[in-house]
Amino acid sequence: MTSFCGSSNTLAASAPQPEKFTNTHIEYKTTWRDMWKVTKAYFRDNRDAATPTFDIPVSALTPQMLDAVAEDSVIKLGHSTTLLKLAERYILIDPVFSERASPVQWMGPKRFHQAPISLEDLPKLDAVIISHDHYDHLDKGSIEILKNKVDVFITPLKVGNHLRDWGVDANKVVELNWWQSTKVSDIEIVATPSQHFSGRGLFDRDETLWASWVI
């Protein structure tokens, strides 16, 4: 189901930490002091600095409206959550529908508005693509609801471990390294390099891969 496309420019594990992924160019260097500052700000949820000063326009989206779209479309559902309708196929990217992008729902960054369509009203999805495992891109609650209405989940290397832990059928998970590709019907999806990092806690930094995508 997967293949290498073009010349390989894959990630190499760093020598002193062979279980971690690295960027090909500039590395992010953070100290424990940096991590503490970020974590403190994350959980305190500094609304004064982050809250928009104007209302964000949100147009409700219904299943009937999606069905009526005759041409290829890109529909932004909030933050990085994006629904693609391509050749009558539905592909959802980085689904985050929970109230907060956080390991718990009683604290952490809170969304500014509800998604224009609910998880339950989404059509059957041909694929879900995940870019990396940060909480604002990989949402456990959303995955648990979506897992039975998605044909395939496409992730960077080792991100699939989260999905399988949350009950997604292992046969539905495709993990790709940079420059590997897979197909959904006639649509080719290629994992490409990105400059970032990964992790969902204090001690799992860069243990999963991150990627941009060409579709």
State where each predicted segment sits.
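Helix-loop-beta element that forms the nucleotide-linked donor phosphate-binding surface
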Residues: 163-177
